[in-house]
């Protein structure tokens, strides 16, 4: 059966149709309502001892949040925990897996999901000897982890400041700094079963021992690497073809002042956002624009988010179109966790309302402390809290996603302009006694 109704917007042949309360019809669409100001909370995961440098990744197939943490006084091995979302916004964590993911004191680590249930790629700097990568497979039911063979990315010399980003199923891009030569390397990583292979590119020399980041736009495999040299934060563009990284253009100097803790996220429309601590302790963010159709990148003017920060992380709320800053707020309780949304407009951003999530000093979010999960309607993760370095989770709400799918009635067979009369092919049963939409 078919019905006719006024189109509330231009419709194309085959569009799925929802009916509005005024009797007009429109495309079924996702909706989003902003949570303003943002809300959030933190819950204790583990306080049995000190835990450091929590890095997080989301397994979309298994619907689990995974955290890799450094056990004990900054010199212990890496452990993996996972969180399951229950009713409401809270996560229930399993922190009982005691398998060490590495064998030597880590100087830095990062993790990404490889696109299938329980399968992750861990990259870490192993003591004074190497930077390495391996597949980590999680059995959530047991629970247990199994470890793939270790691949040396840098086989000799002390390394630090690593990062890794998923780039498709069983694909990733990573970076690691070799301390003895102050050289930053990038790696295109491919996984077959649990075996990792790599292709190496030299990014830069004279790289300082600060946080480095790598992020990629999965729509066009164009990415950004950020690192620090001569006290300035640098952005470098690259393209990725599935097996190799190619550097593009020249360095983009994001700062004219000394920086320290920094983070990076891809948002949308070829826009990345970098966030860092200024040498005057300000929290500063900029929009970086880069796509793979040209050889240059650009960045907008500095946006001051807060006046006294240190460690920080970024997540992108794709439903609410907000960049979420998560940072140690040195101006409140000597380091509580504060979150603040940023709205991108062209090459700049507007700053939303800042909200504190706790009242505890020395809260330390690392650059992958939070991950936005659309199906959970929020950004989730974990970080160390207090001088005892206990681990707490993060739960941040900046928008609520919805859909007009509950108003779905069928589809249109031909295009119609806004205000025109649409003929809708109704799917399902109809009421033969109803002669119109009124």
Show the residue positions of the predicted features.
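A short beta-strand motif characteristic of beta-propeller blades
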Residues: 37-46, 94-101, 148-154, 198-204, ...
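Residue-level signal for glycine
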Residues: 89-91, 144-145, 196, 245, ...
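Extracellular receptor-binding modules and their adjoining Ser/Thr/Gly/Asp/Asn-rich linkers
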Residues: 1-64, 69-71, 80-86, 107-109, ...
